[in-house]
Curated annotation (Swiss-Prot):
EC number(s) per entry: 6.3.5.-
Matching Pfam families: GatB_N, GatB_Yqey
Subunit structure: Heterotrimer of A, B and C subunits.
Xref: SUPFAM superfamilies: GatB/YqeY motif, Glutamine synthetase/guanido kinase
Similarity annotation: Belongs to the GatB/GatE family. GatB subfamily.
Full protein name: Aspartyl/glutamyl-tRNA(Asn/Gln) amidotransferase subunit B
GO BP field: glutaminyl-tRNAGln biosynthesis via transamidation; translation
Amino acid sequence: MTTTTDELVSYEDALASYDPVMGLEVHVELGTKTKMFCGCSTELGAEPNSQTCPTCLGMPGALPVVNAIGVESAIKIGLALHCEIAEWCRFARKNYFYPDMPKNFQTSQYDEPIAFNGYLDVQLEDGEVFRVEIERAHMEEDTGKSTHVGGATGRIHGASHSLLDYNRAGIPLIEIVTKPIEGAGERAPEVAKAYVAELRELIRALGVSEARMEMGQMRCDVNLSLRPHGREKFGTRSETKNVNSLRSVERAARFEIQRHAAVLNSGGTIIQETRHFHEDTGSTTSGRVKEEAEDYRYFPEPDLVPVAPSRAWVEELRAGLPEQPLARRNRLREEWGVNAHDMQSILNAGAIDPIVATIEAGADAASARKWWMGELARSANESGKALEDLPITPAQVARVAQLVVAGELNDKLARQVIEGVLAGEGTPDEVVEKRGLKVVSDEGALTAAVDEAIAGNPGVADKIRGGKVAAAGALVGAVMKATRGQADAARVKELILEKLGVSEG
């Protein structure tokens, strides 16, 4: 009996017979200065294996101590997810052997998590709100990092050897596990993407992690199964591990729906396994047979005391929670006058905070959105960077917008100014000065350029006089060319129509 197939059914055919059921497990690296159970630094970019100690390497006799900031961050996340916070919880040893786990067990939580029974409301692109229920959020430590050398895929299969860096081993993690997500139907992949995006915004708003997926600070495991319409029992699930972008979460879920349906339609059986997602093809491949909880032989961690957060502390943390991201977006959407689809695009681009900061620096909302979602988003895509990593500040973007409003720059010149700032040529004002980019505001010079354009294009001028006002665009273009794009196009058009005795209406 087949358990896999290289063939896929269409997405529509898959949904014609089956309902998708998802479970999402999101791992977030907490932004503490030291590791979860020792004093080693968590700073990125250090020499391999330079941020380790006997505790995070699992040496005999080394005793762990719980990072209080890690516990506080976990409680904040639980509260923001509307979870119940445990009055008493403890750590457990998750036992398995793998080179990136030097202790041969991971310190995690099993049946007593720090937070449980919550939910997160997520908004889809058409504005519909879907509630994702949270099973639990628990604390654990990250593993080391394996780099497989010599293989074609960068994975262990076919590699000649592997390099191990234990700097990451012991970094605080919180794992957020959803309850089975049912009822999303054809929108299941979209719901998965929206959930991870919403969770990322929430984590950032709390200030407990930068949640940079491209840097591995936030990773998602996509569990998916199918069940025939009308049946209550869940199907066998697969788990696509460590998906590291919003788009990939959606693509992985969609691919697995099609793959599962193809196997089931051919009379095959889905095996419970982990799978790897491939960005280049949008497909998944088999990893290993998925273990059950009992395979890890969990037992209470004897070297750590239980965690018992006081109710007063929990309520103090609750009182300090920021505005929920969805509520904030709805408020900003009203203030900015944008629809739900556009707001979702802004969210997916990671542009909300830069736009807000640009408005606070003096730009109007429309200009701030235009530059961050236009020229700067294009630059980020071309360079493979996040918007926040571009070498330009919200204050500098606001200054460009102010120069446009003041009539000192037009959009074309403003784009050149932004290009100069991104290239390291200085502040917007310095780039304007160096490149000589100010709009031609001398009426005499503009009038002369307009006269020259009319004289050089008599046929176009006659059309305009005859009532074809749209033809003025050709003369505006001629003037802009003559002034090297440094004229105010709107003022040029006004002068052309005045010269030809034609009104705009």
